Amino acid sequence: YDRLTGYFRARALTLAARGIEGLVRNNGRMRLLVGCTLNPPEVEAIAKGAECRAQVTAHLLANPLKPGNQREVEALELLAWMVANQILEVQVAVPCDEHRRPMPAQGIFHEKAGIIEDKTGDRLAFNGSLNETEAGWTQNWESLNIFRSWLGDDPRVAAEETNFAKLWSGESRHVITMPVPDALRDDLLRFL
């Protein structure tokens, strides 16, 4: 599952728990490219997960993230577990100028699209207004365009895949992308 989103909240993962269970069972992977809008507990969970792949559970218990309620605790634990077990890779996207310098307060990466491939090779792509947040999935009025490879939409699916690959690999001229721990080291998250 490849996903581009302007906003991400860990609680969105709990809404997709059944799908994530299937992803894990089938050795699937998720790549999430999110605008630099992560809140501090989520950045911390991702960073902790990336730094302690061998001992996630013990590390989380020893270093609580201070979320506001039990649902947030569970969402952040799931996020860190997915990162630590290499099921989820997260990168941040920061708009940049023509010299590839981040542009503070000049807009955000706000693209919203996704590509899902099943074990038979069928692919579904979507784009629209939906962010990867609990409110986006359950409360907001959103629009979504869906393209299915098995129904003749293969060119549209391929276009979404190409766009994702270009952004994920850092080949876009006006967006810098990098894994969250790198962003912490490079101080890019000050542009949140």
PLM segments and residue spans:
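PLD/PLD-like phosphodiesterase catalytic module centered on the HKD motif
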Residues: D2-L192
